[in-house]
Design a protein with these regions (language model features):
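Tandem repeat scaffolds
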Residues: 1-118
């Protein structure tokens, strides 16, 4: 099924849109709920293996999210907050940590104190 030049509200429920393609489509105020979008090039969404590139998520909120194994590169997180999160095994490399605080402590101060005592 091919649609071109549509300018209407669509409601799609309980459907399989496997291998669908959306190109040059404006989707302001679109909602995706209880949706599986594996390997896509948004409550209850499976986006495992999705790729996000040149995406603006400023002021976005993520709650009850599984980001295990995620790779984050060349990302701006300035003035953000990470709260009640498991950071076990996380590595932070080659990052600007100016003003970064963990539980109220400046990380740069902690690193300086560590280096002074080794």
């Amino acid at each position: 099924m091919e649609h071109t030049g549509l300018s209407e509200t669509m409601v799609v429920t309980d459907s399989v849109l496997e291998e669908s393609s959306f190109s040059g489509v404006a989707m302001p105020s679109v909602r995706f709920e209880d949706t599986r979008m594996r390997s896509a090039r948004i409550d209850h969404v499976d986006m495992a293996d999705a790729v996000f590139s040149r995406v603006k998520l400023a002021r976005a909120r993520f709650t009850i999210v599984d980001l295990s194994g995620v790779h984050i590169e060349n990302v701006m997180l300035a003035n953000g907050t990470i709260q009640d999160a498991s950071l076990a095994g996380v590595e932070i490399n080659d990052c600007d940590i100016e003003g970064l605080r963990i539980n109220g402590y400046l990380v740069s101060d902690l690193i300086a104190a560590y280096r002074k005592n080794i």
